[in-house]
Amino acid sequence: MADPGPASFSTRANALLRKNLTYQKRNLWSNIRLIMIPFYLCILLVIIQILFDTQVNNSADNRCGCECIERNRAGKCQRELCGLEHSKPDQAFFCSIPRPPLWPPLLQIPRPESRDVRGLRDDSCRRTGSCPVTILFTGNNRSLGTTVSENLFTSSVSANASEILRTLANNVLGTTVEADFTNYLDPGIASNLSIYNIQPRCILNATFPFSFEQPPLKFEKELRCVQGSNLWTNTSKEVNDKIFKGYKKGNPEGKINEIAAAYDLLNTDRNNFNVHIWYNSTYKDDAGNRLIKLIRVPRSVNLVSNAYLQFLQGPGTRMLFEYVKEMPKPETSLRLDIASLIGPLFFTWVILLLFPVILSSLVYEKQQHLRIIMKMHGLGDGPYWMISYAYFLTISVLYVICLMIFGSAIGLKFFRLNSYSIQFVFYFLYLNLQIALAFLVSSVFSKVKTSTVASYIYVFGSGLLGLFLLNFLIEDSSFPRGWIIVMELYPGFSLYRGLYELAQFAFRGNLRGEDGMKWKDFGDSAMDDVFYIIVVEWFLALIAAYYIDKISSSGRNPLFFLQNPFKKSPSLRRPSLQRQGSKVSVDMEKPDVTHESKKVERLMLESSTSHAIVCDNLKKVYPGRDGNPPKLAVRGLSLAVPSGECFGMLGPNGAGKTSFINMMTGLLKPTSGTALVQGLDICNDMDRVYTSMGVCPQHDLLWETLTGREHLLFYGRLKNLKGADLNQAVEESLKSVNLFHGGVADKPAGKYSGGMKRRLSVAISLIGNPKVVYMDEPSTGLDPASRKNLWTVIKRAKQNTAIILTTHSMEEAEFLCDRLGIFVDGGLQCIGNPKELKGRYGGSYVFTMTTSSEHEQNVEKLIKDVSPNAKKIYHIAGTQKFELPKEEVRISEVFQAVEKAKSNFTVFAWGLADTTLEDVFIKVVRNGQAFNVFS
């Protein structure tokens, strides 16, 4: 098959996308259960809503007031009459009101004990309730302002019972009772407290009784005179200062000095009327899930307008503000949307539940080393990030769309009343932030269980903290708004705040029979701040996640982005000069290793690519920890492997083989030295190296739910195989490792035996004809027949490929490897083909004999007679092994000596063997360890 060349960005992205879709297809029921979570929650909210409506609407306090007009003998009411006249102020809202009452316009004034007394001699007026009502004035023209302020109040208190509203309108009436959220019943009139008549001058405790009737309602009220005090201030800043310091927390003494109202006449003159009005907005009581109360601002506007008209036209001119009136209404019931009341908590949990799913998926690929194995087979960071991000975003968007559709379908006002476009934009922005955070946080965790526990703590903790902490502080008008914004920097709180705002608008809209949040309301809520916070955090989290991923996955310097991208590495095409004296002295004892090193130096100076792998003085030192010295894992390795050669690495555990493979595959950064793979430097061009590389790791890195065929299709696409070539390569690979017949190819890898998984890992490493393949103990766990078959596959694959494999099987090394290198303590002790090594280190026969213990001396005498220079190498329980130099023995003489010995003592077993590769390995390892200890 022709070389397909490196895969493009789109090809690799397509491969990952197909793999992800197949993977999710295998996990279909898990995805369905995930999507059903919002369905279950919405149904739960509907059930709670039904139970709530049934319970609440049966309460007498939540319906129009009634009076019993007929009782039976037992005293039980048989007939009742309901209406506004029988209702308490709280019940009036529920009554049918075809002709709403007319109410005199009242000015909101402070309670007597809270009025401003800073300009008085003392505060004794508070004990008698006679403190004046203070109103502040300012503007550009003090003379005009003084005249206007003098026209503010009247002295008329005459009453005409036939025209009571007009009579009251000619006076400036005030009340200390806050308004309700409707004007069907004015609490200022309905309460038992006095109505105040604000006049320029008052007789102490002067009162005027009057009767106010609006059928079917009738009230006997008392009009109490109170003095109005108009004070001039030079600037609006002084007005703000006086108002703020009159607030209990605005002065160190904690005193209350409330101002009723304030006016800034600005540039008002005879041709221009321009005024700013201050009022106490806390009377709106707009914190929490309740309707905003009305505030008595209209009378303030009318007063200053009348005062200006009288300034222009004289005291006989005025705009009479006769009454305020609500719109007619039918009888209503209490409409409380439970989804809006508890929705912020529930929907915070619903949306955040995606976070553990995304995080677990990312950490799983990290824990199982699937991310790095994909990267080793050519999947770069760009396609991985783009497809993974787009995939998670698609799943998340479908999730919230299902939530919105189902919530709307079952009638939840939270979704129906608020603008769908606002909801979608809010969810979309937050989902992007949540995905970016998952990528960022995934770099912290290495275990799925740990990440899952931590993420669910985050999910439920965020919802509960939002309900009991953030919700409380939002509704606390004294808590600084700036600190609320700071708290919303925590992503869980920004989500909760956005849902809180949507819930508030839906709740009020449901009570009023209006819409919830629309784009025109955007500036009147905290949603603009939430949007800004989410967008900025999304951008920052995405950059931070990508940056940390680059550092952690490639071992780059944290300041890698400051390096000159056009600066060539000094290691390219130049041999390393970091040769230590100890290395030179060792190489003098190993001519084969020295020859390899010189060969590497020559290749580094040439432009030839005949050798697929060239390692130049590659070294890895692990830093010391806990007081231990640094660990030298690889001691300046120089090695050249041409295309078409299989190079085997032998060595005891801890010799440095794995560290070397990890450096070559990009898992570790070399401490010094470098290596070229197809002419590309592993220190600077690892992403390009991956496109021509195959890896069979020591442990099988597979997706348990994907089949063997799907694994090979994925990795084949990463190697730029397409169409018929891809299918042919996959089938050939499956057949070569005996995973094709009997439907095995289409079984999930999780159902494979250990040997089948191993064969699949080898097939993955070889698909697409990579130029370089690293195999770490490829035949581990295979039965003899499968092992022989696998060796044949590897031997056939090496024709156009450079293969480096590690193994503990001498048989495997001898069958597969063209050359062998034996590693001891991080250094290469010898290098050559198996026959050369056996010839070089195996100039002796191995004689073995087993007898009873009392005849051990006889065996030693026998060997000394045959070979005076023989050396005992093994002795245990009557079994002894000797090395016999080939130059001083003949095989026939050994046989004759043994036959003669059998007549003198009993021989249980004996044998004579030529030197094996295992004997060479043991000898080299022992010599190498002894030399390193001596050094």
Curated annotation (Swiss-Prot):
InterPro entries: AAA+_ATPase (IPR003593), ABC2_TM (IPR013525), ABC_transporter-like_ATP-bd (IPR003439), ABC_transporter-like_CS (IPR017871), ABCA (IPR026082), P-loop_NTPase (IPR027417)
Gene Ontology cellular component terms for the protein in this record: membrane; plasmodesma
GO molecular function terms noted in the UniProt entry: ABC-type transporter activity; ATP binding; ATP hydrolysis activity
Membrane topology: Multi-pass membrane protein
Cysteine pairings via disulfide bonds: none
Residues the record lists as binding ATP: 651-658
Primary location class: membrane
Sequence ranges assigned to domain ABC transporter in this UniProt record: 613-850
Entry's localization field: Membrane
SMART domains, per the entry: AAA
Keyword tags: ATP-binding, Membrane, Nucleotide-binding, Transmembrane, Transmembrane helix, Transport
Region (Disordered), start-end ranges: 571-591
Annotated TM spans: 34-54, 338-358, 392-412, 424-444, 454-474, 483-503, 528-548
Family listed: Belongs to the ABC transporter superfamily. ABCA family. CPR flippase (TC 3.A.1.211) subfamily.
Protein name: ABC transporter A family member 7
Organism of provenance: Arabidopsis thaliana (Mouse-ear cress)
Gene coding for it: ABCA7
